[in-house]
Amino acid sequence: MSYAVIVTGGKQYKVAEGEFLKIEKLEIATGESVTFDRVLLVANGEEVTIGAPVVAGAKVVAEVVSQGRHDKVRIIKFRRRKHHMKRMGHRQWFTEIKITGIQA
């Protein structure tokens, strides 16, 4: 089984071909292809290539499946004994992708 570790949106993801993944929002239309050049590691069976910091010539190709928002994260700020409470919520945007190829 081959897999790779990519960097996008300030986070690292371990990806394999055919896998679906929710990442930070990308400004790319649904159905279009996206290429990730920042590949930190590529493994193909027993052969593992680790980049310093990235693997030269490696890229991961994916297709944008959908755009959406995660479930709401709710927070409450509360001050004891002061009869003060503040409720807030946030929904983060995401892009769902399908990994179509790993090239090393």
UniProtKB/Swiss-Prot annotation:
Keywords: Ribonucleoprotein, Ribosomal protein, RNA-binding, rRNA-binding. GO terms for cellular component: cytoplasm; ribonucleoprotein complex; ribosome. The keyword Ribonucleoprotein applies. Signal peptide: none annotated. GO terms for molecular function: rRNA binding; structural constituent of ribosome. InterPro entries: bL21-like, bL21-like_sf, Ribosomal_bL21, Ribosomal_bL21_CS. One of its GO terms (biological process) is translation. PANTHER family: 50S RIBOSOMAL PROTEIN L21 (PTHR21349), LARGE RIBOSOMAL SUBUNIT PROTEIN BL21M (PTHR21349:SF0). Part of the 50S ribosomal subunit. Contacts protein L20. Belongs to the bacterial ribosomal protein bL21 family. This protein binds to 23S rRNA in the presence of protein L20. This is Large ribosomal subunit protein bL21.
